[in-house]
């Protein structure tokens, strides 16, 4: 378990209730160990909240949508922090989740299996 900013706990809880469409769609596929591993949603890690986290594989999945277009530096800093903890980060576009879920799941499963 990783330490996290306690102020993020309530925000993460609220995010789970109000997730965007792509997060909800991907969560429907990831929950209940459908890919053979357990994921949690909106997981605080350090000063960040990961969209999805698999403790067993030390894997974060982030969905990047239009709101991420101008956040390259923030995402890079966040990815470096996760890497410093030994956590792998997969970034998936919002568009791919909505339009190509089967290939998204194949790609996630491939990465889960190789970690």
What is each residue range found by the language model?
Residues 15-19, 46-111:
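Basic, amphipathic alpha-helical patches used to engage nucleic acids or provide basic targeting signals
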Residues 42:
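Charged, terminal alpha-helix-loop-beta segments
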Residues 38-39, 68:
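A short, acidic/glycine-rich surface segment
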């Amino acid at each position: 378990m990783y330490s996290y900013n306690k102020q993020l706990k309530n925000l993460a809880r609220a995010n789970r209730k109000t997730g965007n469409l792509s997060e909800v769609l991907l969560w429907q596929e990831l929950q209940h160990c459908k890919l053979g591993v357990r994921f949690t949603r909106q997981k605080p890690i350090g000063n960040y909240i990961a969209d999805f986290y698999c403790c067993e594989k030390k894997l974060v999945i982030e969905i990047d949508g239009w709101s991420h277009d101008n956040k390259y530096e923030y995402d890079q800093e966040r990815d470096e922090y996760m890497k410093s903890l030994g956590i792998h980060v997969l970034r998936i576009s919002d568009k791919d989740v909505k339009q190509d879920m089967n290939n998204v799941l194949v790609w996630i499963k491939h990465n889960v299996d190789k970690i």
